[in-house]
Amino acid sequence: MRRAFGASLPTDEELAISREITEFDRTLAFFDGPDVVATAGIFSYEMTVPGGRLRCAGVTRVAVLSTHRRRGLLTAMMRRQLADVHERGEPLAALYASEAPIYGRFGYGLATYQTALEIDRPHGTFAQTLSGNGRLTMVDVPTAVPAFTRVWEQARQSQPGMLGLDERWIRNQLADLELHRDGASPHYRVLYQLGDDPAGFAIYRIKMDWDASGPNGTVRLGMLIAATTEAYASLWRHVLDVDLMTRITAEMRPVEEPLRFLLADSRQPRTRVEDGIWLRLVDVLAALAGRRYAVEGQLVLGVRDGFCPWNAGQFELRGGPTAAEARRTTASPDLELDAAALGALYLGGNRFGTLHRAGLIREVQPGAVARADAMFATDRAPWCPSHF
């Protein structure tokens, strides 16, 4: 995989970190003689969906050497993976795409978005004075792992798109490899506690620089996760107050970042929207029944799925805020769409109306698009803040 992405071979430290999370029984490889020429893997996750949680296969480490392109290796691995996911009863599969055009043909749709942001520190003043009873402390990795794991579990309860991470995975997210520093410092790990209870954390680096006018450093925020509004504001205040810095940068932030409304200068932060995770419904019935819906409603969806033919057909969905059920039906569909479009819509990060105007949904029954948008609406935009 490293060769296919133009990277150097992994160090012993990288291999040790990778080995702890690798599921070798879910790892595929093509060989040409003794040489590995294509790879794909899966991590077994649980994803928060609107109103619930579902098992999700995290597709990862997908690569084909340039010498072996256009031979069907990627298609064969995708087909093998999705058959395995289906056999294991995982309703969802998700991935990050190195190139956007690749995965739509396999039924993946762009389901979440994220932002990269930059803030000029002089414009980082809050509109109101911060109040709170919590405390911030710098922590080492042994302290951070259990505390950050507790925070993560609390935060993901209400955040569609977040994946469940145990201590093994939090330790992986805390890995502080030299190749990731790009001239910046080692990690700073900050824990926010209310009493003895962890409620938020931030991980960042600082890149020190000087010019003729003085210090000109950058805070590179790697992750900020908070289970309470107080923890969120306090952690951002800390990041914005690091001495000798003139700017703060961050990636993989939510599109609905409350920080903008905390700042006196609402034109900060400057943001760039990027694609997040691509989602595929591997079991349409289980996925539709496994989430909850903003309003009570009924829809018949006609789904086209050439890559996973067990998903093709008409599905009647009845759901609301407290319960949902789905079943196959022979009734005429209200809407017709393919698997990739359904994946893009499932978490609520895109609107049926938008995809309808793009020609990706056929509205058979008038008013069905508006009804679907009302049902699939969420109070939070989906967000996945972890790499895999």
Language model feature labels by segment:
Residues 1, 28-30, 58, 72:
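Hydrophobic, small-residue-rich alpha-helical packing segments that form membrane-like cores
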Residues 3-7, 32, 128-388:
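Intrinsically disordered, low-complexity, positively biased terminal segments
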Residues 8-20, 25-29, 39-47, 51, ...:
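N-terminal, Lys/Arg-enriched amphipathic/low-complexity engagement segments
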Residues 29, 35-45, 56-58, 63, ...:
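Conserved beta-strand in the GNAT
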Residues 47-58, 69, 209-218:
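A conserved beta-turn-beta hairpin within the catalytic core of GNAT-like acetyltransferases
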Residues 59-86, 228-240:
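Conserved acetyl-CoA-binding loop-helix of GNAT-fold acetyltransferases
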